[in-house]
Amino acid sequence: MPFRPLLTALVERVPGAQGAIVADWEGESVDQVGIMDDYDLKVIGAHKGVILHSMREVVDRLGDDELKEIVITTKQAQTVIMPVTEDYYLVLTLDRSDMLGRALLEARRCIQALYKEIV
């Protein structure tokens, strides 16, 4: 699956992007691109998978429809978590001071392209 070009385009299009990773349901990296350390990006991807799993359980218990995206904002960074399918998800990390709206727009575009590659 050619994920690297899609992830590269995502990171290049989002000002302040530090990295993007596609991981499977176990939190294992399928592919990743970033200016941050590869190991750190893999750890972030795995941890955000745990958050995604927990949020999916909450959404299911509430009887709501499927979870589309999660945004985590800290003092220094923002992280976007988006499911691609039931088994794969995208994590995008970026600087806190940069444009979250642009990041969400580009991540949604990337999700559509990733979905086409996976399904």
Feature-to-residue mapping (PLM):
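Non-catalytic interaction/Regulatory regions outside core domains
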Residues: M1-V119
